């Protein structure tokens, strides 16, 4: 495995296996892990907790300007703190999920969080960074970039399985509709639309196991390290 500084950018829509694979990859590489999607979810929860309409752009910008957020970079931890309270369960709830695209589409919100994401990745030095615009905006110089994708139906089934396993009520048709809607919102927004970086390796995980995806990512990382040593 490559030693020293290492930044791996993993992008893609929800339900592609990004989080599970990114955490496993960080563990295998003895690296830190940063879930940027969780940061936008915390911002959304903060807005909702204050009774702010996510469509009120000015109010959202003001509320998230100094977000009291702390997120673990340990790949074995899911702790996410908002004002000192662990909100890892709340940020995955249906209300946050239905509004996170609107909040994350606001350029000022993205600018604030992108600056924080860059600082955290730089401090970690060796980090797997997961999100939707890591390779295209946040860390454009990352030596390893992967874009995970899968069919909407497969991704909806995975999300449905996650929700039911966590004890959250879920309806497959509603989950599928939400997946399709968020894809459209994220890929058409003006600020940092969801799309693969030109130099990203695109991996369709529809028919792949997590171990197969992990093996592919490790091979990409090792190949990148070999090129940098030549």
Swiss-Prot record:
Keywords: ATP-binding, Cytoplasm, Kinase, Nucleotide-binding, Transferase. It comes from Corynebacterium efficiens (strain DSM 44549 / YS-314 / AJ 12310 / JCM 11189 / NBRC 100395). Transmembrane segments: none annotated. This is Cytidylate kinase. Belongs to the cytidylate kinase family. Type 1 subfamily. It catalyses: CMP + ATP = CDP + ADP; dCMP + ATP = dCDP + ADP. ATP binds at residues 12-20. Its EC number is 2.7.4.25. Pfam families: Cytidylate_kin. One of its GO terms (molecular function) is dCMP kinase activity. One of its GO terms (biological process) is nucleobase-containing small molecule interconversion. One of its GO terms (cellular component) is cytosol. The keyword Cytoplasm applies. It is found in: Cytoplasm.
């Amino acid at each position: 495995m490559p030693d020293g500084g290492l930044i791996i950018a993993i992008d893609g829509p929800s339900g592609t296996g990004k989080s599970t694979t990114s955490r496993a990859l960080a563990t295998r590489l003895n690296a830190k892990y940063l879930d940027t999607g969780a940061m936008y979810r915390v911002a959304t929860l903060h807005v909702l907790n204050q009774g702010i309409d996510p469509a009120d752009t000015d109010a959202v910008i003001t509320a998230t300007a100094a977000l009291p957020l702390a997120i673990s970079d340990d790949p074995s931890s899911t702790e996410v703190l908002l004002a000192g309270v662990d909100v890892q369960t709340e940020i995955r709830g249906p209300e946050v999920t239905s509004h996170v695209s609107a909040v994350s589409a606001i350029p000022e919100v993205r600018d604030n969080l992108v600056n924080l994401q860059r600082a955290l990745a730089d401090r970690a030095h060796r980090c797997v960074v997961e999100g939707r615009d890591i390779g295209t905006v946040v860390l454009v110089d990352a030596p390893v970039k992967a874009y995970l994708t899968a069919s909407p139906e497969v991704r909806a089934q995975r999300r449905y399985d996650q929700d039911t396993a966590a004890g959250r009520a879920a309806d497959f048709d509603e989950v599928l509709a939400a997946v399709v809607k968020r894809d459209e919102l994220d890929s058409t927004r003006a600020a940092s639309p969801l799309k693969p970086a030109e130099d990203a390796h695109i991996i369709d995980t529809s028919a792949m196991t997590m171990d197969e995806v992990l093996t592919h990512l490790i091979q990409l990382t090792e190949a990148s390290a070999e090129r940098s040593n030549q």
